Structure formats: structure tokens, C-alpha cells
Amino acid sequence: MNAARTGYRVFSANSTAACTELAKRITERLGAELGKSVVYQETNGETRVEIKESVRGQDIFIIQTIPRDVNTAVMELLIMAYALKTACARNIIGVIPYFPYSKQSKMRKRGSIVCKLLASMLAKAGLTHIITMDLHQKEIQGFFSFPVDNLRASPFLLQYIQEEIPNYRNAVIVAKSPDAAKRAQSYAERLRLGLAVIHGEAQCTELDMDDGRHSPPMVKNATVHPGLELPLMMAKEKPPITVVGDVGGRIAIIVDDIIDDVESFVAAAEILKERGAYKIYVMATHGILSAEAPRLIEESSVDEVVVTNTVPHEVQKLQCPKIKTVDISLILSEAIRRIHNGESMAYLFRNITVDD
């Protein structure tokens, strides 16, 4: 497309070729070309970004997929956004299918809400809008001072189930923990299938029995009620792992938003096999697949892992043929087209509920 006529350009902020595949798919659907830029790491480890064409007065979309080197990808995005802001781009929209640090969106003891810090950094760098997909916590949208479109991958995964899983009508949707039950219920209702929930082996949070007090107790407590102590939350017990729901003689489809460390999925597959499931699928939006994930999946009872291409995982697919990919470039390219043309985004969220 002619940049002067359309008034928008699409750039990729990734410095590695493997991470630009999604950007190429999106631009092909738009009938556009990737903007001319150079992103690379200098010998001293610093990230450098050079914009090789005029972007003055245009809508700029930066596509940034997150590889294993998360911090480098974040710096690439920040520096490119700032470079485009300095070059007088009209609007700078970040297309970040998997939003990094989304697991650090809650306060834990003396930690910090890193996701909120990243949101502030992106705004300071010059971003005016973000398109993302299946945020780990929907409340993350409130961290931003500009619009965030949180698209859903579930329509693509539901379509995969209907078209690629033989005899899917004999399947049951499984939540690998009670926390994932709402997502699993949404899938089950749309496919008119049964629901099962795996419960047990609850992970205890870190206990801190030292109250950190160096001062003497309150005078009233010390004199009137010497035995009074602050009530403490009871520690969680670890009940035996169990499956709530019937999976005997069925296909089990475990659904979640992120597959990173796969030990919990492997354990879930084992218990489902013991309970009579004859085939097991794992489906998620973001396939991070860290560390030994490909080997563990290959050696496990899981028959197939289905993820979208929000995160590049071609190396993991070579290591484990069980991993399959669903392309979501269609919805991202449509979102870009609608935002640039000032059209409603409501159609992309049709039939989406708060539990999706």
C-alpha cells in the first residue's frame, strides 16, 4: 500500500528474524509492507533502533512479539516507540499479542506490581494505544492511561477443536485448577460439552512466622490481655489430587491462557489418564514453553498441545512434534485496519463475556 495515501505504517520492533514472522503475516493480510527500520544489539549490549523512512503525521503500529529474552524485547519496543515519537508520528499503537510481566500484576509481600511499571514506561515512551490478546489478568487494562484492546483467541481455539479433533462431541473440557474453571466453563458452554475440574495439591504461599516487630507490645494488650495475639490465616493443606467430573472414556481438553512451565499440565494429564480419559489435549493462547517444556510434553501422556502464534515457538516445535500452532494474525490485522480507519471494535468482541 502507498504510505502517503493510507496514512499508516506497520513496523516490527524485533531484532531477531524468528520473531518477525507474525508481523509479516499481518502485513500480508493488510496488503502493506513492513516499515523500514533497523533494530540491533551493539557490541556493548545496548539496543539501537533506526527508523529509515518518514513517519510524520502517520498512524504507526509497532508489532512486538516476546521471545525468551523478554527484557531485550521490552527495550526494543520502548526505544522504537520513543524514536517514532521523536519523528512526529501522529499515533503510536503497540501490537503486543503477549503482554510481558503480566504474571507480576499483583502485590506479594515486599514485591512490586511490575506490570504497572511497564505500563507507565510504555506511556512515557510515546505509545497512545495497545492491542493485546488474552491478558493474564483482565484488571491489567486499568494500569494504562490510554486505550487497551484485549482481544480473545478463544474463537480460533474453538474452531480448531471443531475442525481438527475427531469425535470432539465425546470430549470434556477440563480446568487444571479451580482458578481456571471460568475459562473452562466458557469453552464447555460454547461447545455444549461437559466440564471437569482438577482439584488438589494446593500450593501454599510463603509463610513468614516472624512478625517483624522490634517495639514492645501495646500497653493495653500487655497489661489487660497478656495472651492476646493477632489472628493468623490458617495454612492451606494439600488434599489428594482429584477430578471433579466424569472423564472416563472421553477426550479430555485442558484449557488455559498460558503454557509456560508444563509440570502442572503433565500432572493433570496423568490423573486424567488414570481416571479413564483416552486422549488428552492441552490448549492455550500463549505458548511460552520455557526450559524443558518440549521434552516433558514429548515424554508425557499429553497427545497434543495447541497454542497460538502470539509467542514464537518454532524451536520448541522442532523438539516436540506434539506442539501445534493456530494462526491469529487475522484478528490482529483486522484490529489494525479498524483502529486506523476509526471504525468500531465491538464486532471483534461479539459474544464475549466477562468470563472469556
UniProtKB/Swiss-Prot annotation:
GO terms for biological process: 5-phosphoribose 1-diphosphate biosynthetic process; nucleobase-containing compound metabolic process; purine nucleotide biosynthetic process. This is Phosphoribosyl pyrophosphate synthase-associated protein 1. GO terms for molecular function: enzyme inhibitor activity; enzyme regulator activity; identical protein binding; magnesium ion binding. Keywords: Acetylation, Nucleotide biosynthesis, Phosphoprotein. InterPro entries: Pribosyltran_N, PRTase-like, Rib-P_diPkinase. Binds to PRPS1 and PRPS2. It holds the Pfam family Pribosyl_synth. The modification Phosphoserine is found at residues 177, 215. SUPFAM superfamilies: PRTase-like. Ubiquitous. The modification N-acetylmethionine is found at residue 1. Gene3D superfamilies: 3.40.50.2020. It comes from the Eukaryota. GO terms for cellular component: cytoplasm. Seems to play a negative regulatory role in 5-phosphoribose 1-diphosphate synthesis. Belongs to the ribose-phosphate pyrophosphokinase family. PANTHER family: PHOSPHORIBOSYL PYROPHOSPHATE SYNTHASE-ASSOCIATED PROTEIN 1 (PTHR10210:SF28), RIBOSE-PHOSPHATE DIPHOSPHOKINASE FAMILY MEMBER (PTHR10210).
